């Protein structure tokens, strides 16, 4: 049977309210024109971005994923899905499964337990940078009431795009000296951007011409067609490899109502900052002049911008679809106005009725983020350990007690008290390792992310940290070094938001709390693709004696391969 098909029929499951949604996907490279310049993209069933999955809370999703790449392994991570009872389906190569070899098919099977805006992406090498991503939208279960009221919705997947291929980028990052990937050439909205022209050329000081498109152009923007005096839900997800973004709609207020798949206390803003790995829902009311169209913009924040903002158009159906707005697009806030960014983050509170965090913690980790050298190679390290994922997936090693699958020694839970976070490290050296933090089942863990200066003076970056397998409560943010016994007094324990991704700001700290109630092994890492490639991550293992059955197909590499062969052929 040919594999260029997709099964989109929902099969009734054992309960009346849940369905099984089954898909067959092939992933391969193809030529595309994401930003009006031809390049290689990773496509799912020929689509870039990949197909959108729509499901209801409680549904089971089954994806038969075939690797049609000639020379690369493959996995897909279901970003924001907690994988309760299915840690092997999380899609993190070397952590929860082996990479799928070329020509092979692996089946993901998991339940989506609650509604929310999510996405999926490659999690092997830097395949997300190559375009392996798509949207994953979970609506409320049948018979349940959506608390938000709106007349229609749009789904916008934001990403950044380079003209240099990802393999060259990976080689450069792993070279001595390192060759940095540089800023992206374009920002894409739903896989479409414009590198050599502008939708707002008449308002720009650059020499770029006004974009003109013909039917079928892959880089032509997807306009959002709206009716006057209606309210629309815009679902935003950032799958960027590097860029932090600011999103705005000209002349319209945004009411932020959801963050990382969790309802929040609504608040109104002119624009929002969105970091790699984050998702939001905003409500927009079309209450402006219905004879006009309006720019939608996504511009770079947090890094000195060398990438033009992405643009598309909010088209009132009472105005000509091809008509461009008559005034300039919203200006992206200054890239290094971090106070503005922090103020936005501090406006996000959990919706009434959301779960509250435990009042105290059982264990605490303070994770220092540093840039270091290992034998002359530039790396990122956590408490002076740069992560190198082992050849045997952690999940297989702990499930079958394979003691040599990774280093079983405990990693540092803190860093030296005299470390100066404001200057380059006195000792630039770090070590490489594959240790994991092991926790008992159902304990409360606090994680303090501590930022610091990089290898160069006056250089501290934003790092968006993403935790697999969990939501966590964001308890607070602070400046400088975290002070145990003092800074806890600033925590928000009343209504902290539940997130799966959180920003760590330059020279500051971010505090989060989670409960180890999901047996498995879970990646926790910076969601900036090159930073993770250079070692910026840790691994949490919890409730190990409660991990259920793991399909053999997930673990057919490394030490688990031989173990399973011996077990199945005594």
UniProtKB/Swiss-Prot annotation:
The keyword Disulfide bond applies. Coiled coil: none annotated. It is an enzyme of class 1 (oxidoreductase). It catalyses: 4 L-ascorbate + O2 = 4 monodehydro-L-ascorbate radical + 2 H2O. Its main location: secreted. Residues 33-140, 154-317, 426-543 form the Plastocyanin-like domain. This is L-ascorbate oxidase. It comes from Brassica rapa subsp. pekinensis (Chinese cabbage). The gene is AO.
């Amino acid at each position: 049977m040919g594999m260029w098909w997709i099964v989109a029929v929902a099969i009734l499951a054992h309960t009346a309210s849940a369905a099984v949604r089954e898909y067959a996907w092939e992933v391969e490279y193809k030529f595309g024109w994401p930003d009006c310049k031809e390049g290689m993209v990773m496509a799912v069933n020929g689509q870039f971005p990949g197909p959108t999955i729509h499901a209801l809370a409680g549904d089971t999703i089954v994806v038969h994923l075939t690797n049609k790449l000639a020379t690369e392994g493959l996995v897909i991570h279901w970003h924001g899905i907690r994988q309760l009872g299915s840690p092997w389906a999380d899609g993190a190569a070397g952590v929860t499964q082996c990479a799928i070899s070329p020509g092979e098919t692996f089946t993901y099977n998991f339940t989506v337990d609650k509604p929310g805006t999510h996405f999926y992406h490659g999690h092997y090498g830097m395949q997300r940078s190559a375009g392996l991503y798509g949207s994953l939208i979970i609506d409320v279960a049948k018979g349940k009431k959506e608390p938000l009221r709106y007349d229609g919705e749009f789904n916008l997947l934001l990403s950044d795009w380079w003209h240099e291929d990802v393999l060259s980028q990976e080689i450069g990052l792993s070279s001595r000296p390192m060759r940095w990937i540089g800023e992206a050439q374009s920002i894409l909205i739903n896989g479409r951007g414009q590198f050599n022209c502008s939708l707002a050329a008449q308002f720009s000081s650059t020499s770029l011409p006004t974009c003109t498109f013909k039917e079928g152009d892959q880089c032509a923007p997807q306009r959002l067609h709206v009716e006057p005096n209606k309210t629309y839900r815009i679902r935003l997800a950032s799958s960027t490899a590097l860029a932090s973004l600011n999103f705005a709609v000209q002349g319209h207020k945004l009411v932020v109502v959801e963050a990382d798949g969790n309802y929040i206390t609504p608040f109104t803003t002119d624009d929002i900052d969105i970091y790699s790995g984050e998702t939001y829902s905003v409500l927009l009311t079309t209450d402006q002049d219905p004879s006009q169209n309006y720019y939608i913009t996504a511009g770079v924040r947090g890094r000195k911008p060398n990438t033009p903002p992405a643009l598309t158009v909010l088209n009132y159906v009472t105005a000509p679809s091809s008509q461009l707005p008559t005034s300039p697009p919203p200006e992206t806030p200054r890239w290094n106005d971090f106070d503005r960014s922090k103020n936005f983050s501090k406006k996000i509170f959990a919706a009434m009725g959301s779960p509250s965090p435990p009042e105290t913690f059982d264990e605490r980790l303070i994770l220092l983020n540093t840039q270091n050298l290992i034998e002359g190679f530039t790396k990122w390290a956590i408490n002076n350990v740069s992560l190198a994922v082992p050849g045997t997936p952690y999940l297989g090693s702990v499930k079958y007690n394979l003691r040599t699958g990774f280093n079983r020694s405990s990693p540092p839970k803190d860093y030296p008290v005299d470390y100066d976070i404001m200057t380059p490290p006195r000792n630039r050296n770090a070590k490489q390792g594959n240790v994991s933090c092991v926790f008992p089942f159902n304990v409360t863990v606090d994680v303090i992310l501590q930022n610091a200066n990089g290898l160069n003076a006056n250089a501290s970056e934003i790092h968006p940290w993403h935790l697999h397998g969990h939501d966590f409560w964001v308890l607070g943010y602070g400046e400088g070094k975290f002070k145990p016994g003092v800074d806890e007094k600033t925590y928000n324990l009343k209504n902290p938001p539940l997130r799966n991704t959180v920003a760590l700001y330059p020279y500051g700290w971010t505090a989060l709390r989670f409960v180890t109630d999901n047996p498995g092994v879970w990646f926790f890492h910076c969601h900036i693709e090159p930073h993770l490639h250079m070692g910026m991550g840790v691994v949490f293992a919890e409730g190990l004696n409660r991990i259920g059955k793991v399909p053999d197909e997930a673990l057919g590499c490394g030490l688990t391969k031989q173990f399973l062969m011996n077990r199945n052929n005594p």
